[in-house]
C-alpha cells in the first residue's frame, strides 16, 4: 500500500464535537488529505477494497448526535466522490468487510434486538440479510475463498463462541463450545420477543425474560430495562 486512511477529529474543541473525518497520508510521509469535507457527522471505520478502487466507511449524518444511524458509504479513489450505498437501509452498518472481488461487502447490523450479518453488492445497492436467529454476531471476518464467514456468537443465555457462517445460505456452524459443560446443569430462562405500540403508533420490539421453571399461574416481580 502507498497510503494510509484513518479517522481524525481535526476541528476546534474536538472533545465536544462528533465531526470526525477520513484522512489519507502517504506511507512515505507527506501532507494529509481530507476525504470527507462537508460531511459534518462521525466518519469512521475505513476499509480499502482488495482492488484498491474503493474505501468503504461508516458515516453519521448529524453532528453532535452520537446515536445517529451509521450509513454505509463508498469513497471512489478515482473520482474522489463519496456516495451512500444503502440510503434506504434503516439500520446502522458495522464491521464492514469486502469480498475478495471488491464487488460486495458483508457487515453486521442490529435488527429487532439481535445482531445479524448482511451483504450488499455495489451493483445491486440493496441490503440482503444473510443470517437469522436470536443472537448477536460480532468480530466478523471473511474467509480467503469467500465461501465462509467467521464470527463470535452470543445470546442472552450464552457468552461468546466462535461460529462459521455459510456466506450463501447463512447456515451457522458452532466451532467452539467452551461453556457447554458449565451450562449443562443450569436451568435457563424462557425468552420471548414481543411488540408493543408506542404513543405515536409505531411498534416497539422488546424481550420478555421469564425465570427458569416459569409458572404462568403465579405472579412474579417485574423489572423494566430500557
Language model regions located:
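Blade-terminus and WD-like Trp-Asp/Gly-His loop motifs, strongest in beta-propeller folds
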Residues: 1-3, 46-54, 96-104, 140-148, ...
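A flexible loop/linker signature enriched in serine peptidases of the S9 family
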Residues: 7-23, 34-47, 54-73, 84-94, ...
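Short loop/turn segments that connect beta-strands within beta-propeller blades
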Residues: 26-30, 76-80, 121-125, 166-170
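Short flexible coil/turn linkers enriched for glycine and charged/polar residues
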Residues: 29, 79, 111, 156, ...
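Structural signal for short hydrophobic segments within the conserved structured cores
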Residues: 33, 83, 128, 173, ...
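Acidic/polar loop patches that form or flank catalytic/metal-binding clefts of enzymes
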Residues: 76, 81-85, 172-174, 217
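Conserved blade-ending motifs and adjacent loop-strand segments that build the rim/top face
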Residues: 85-95, 128-140, 176-187
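Serine-hydrolase catalytic core recognition
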Residues: 102, 139-226
Amino acid at each position: 500500500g502507498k497510503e494510509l486512511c484513518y479517522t481524525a477529529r481535526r476541528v476546534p474543541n474536538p472533545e465536544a464535537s462528533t465531526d470526525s473525518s477520513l484522512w489519507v497520508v502517504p506511507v512515505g510521509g507527506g501532507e494529509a488529505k481530507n476525504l470527507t469535507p462537508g460531511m459534518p457527522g462521525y466518519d469512521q471505520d475505513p476499509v480499502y477494497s482488495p482492488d484498491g478502487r474503493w474505501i468503504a466507511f461508516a458515516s453519521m449524518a448529524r453532528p453532535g448526535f452520537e446515536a445517529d444511524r451509521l450509513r454505509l458509504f463508498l469513497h471512489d479513489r478515482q473520482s474522489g466522490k463519496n456516495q451512500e450505498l444503502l440510503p434506504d437501509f434503516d439500520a446502522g452498518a458495522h464491521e464492514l468487510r469486502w469480498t475478495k472481488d471488491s464487488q460486495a461487502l458483508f457487515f453486521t447490523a442490529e435488527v429487532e434486538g439481535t445482531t445479524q450479518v448482511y451483504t450488499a453488492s455495489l451493483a445491486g445497492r440493496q441490503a440482503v440479510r444473510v443470517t437469522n436467529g436470536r443472537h448477536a454476531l460480532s468480530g466478523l471476518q471473511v474467509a480467503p475463498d469467500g465461501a465462509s464467514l467467521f464470527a463470535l456468537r452470543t445470546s442472552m443465555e450464552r457468552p461468546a463462541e466462535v461460529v462459521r457462517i455459510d456466506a450463501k445460505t447463512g447456515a451457522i456452524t458452532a466451532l467452539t463450545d467452551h461453556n457447554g459443560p458449565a451450562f449443562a446443569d443450569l436451568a435457563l430462562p424462557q425468552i420471548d420477543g414481543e411488540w408493543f405500540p408506542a404513543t405515536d403508533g409505531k411498534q416497539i420490539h422488546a424481550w420478555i425474560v421469564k425465570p427458569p421453571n416459569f409458572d404462568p399461574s403465579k405472579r412474579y416481580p417485574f423489572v423494566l430495562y430500557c
